[in-house]
Amino acid sequence: VKEVLTEYELTVDSYEQVRERPMDNELQEKYYSGKKSNHTFKSQMIILPDDQDIVDVIAGELGPKSDITLFRENRERFDAKQKFKGDLAYVGEDLIETPIKKQKKRELNIEQKESNKKFSQARIFVEHRIHSVKIFRVIQERFRLNSKKYEQVMLTICGLVRLRIKALILPEKRHPISLF
């Protein structure tokens, strides 16, 4: 499977979901995200180009963990030659192509802006897929279930989304006794 995926440039993005505040003070500190001003889980999704399928999902990581750290911890799942597209949160990673960042006190020229626009048009599909996962209320709002079940719930919902986009086609079972 890894060799087949190297033909594609996969798209990667991360997002946070608010969770119940842990009782333990040390856990509270680990899960507190200053960005969201709440205790959060962080998840990362990797999809095929043109929104064809969800390739990989990492769920239930600590909220304040950076996107690039999350990617670096899990990149051994893919071939060393695999290429990715990501947003500015992934700047500095050799395997991930990112948009051109504006320099301090300088504007981007027209070619750079056009390049970023084309890049964003190709990368927007991962945002659409994250939105289709967040349609489910359990992922959209505060996660109130047991925190140990977060990954299981997240993977189940991703399976339902794959079924909805017809990326996961189950074989049709036929009953041995038919009326015809």
Model regions and ranges:
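Short, well-ordered secondary-structure "scaffold" segments embedded in the functional core
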Residues: 1-180
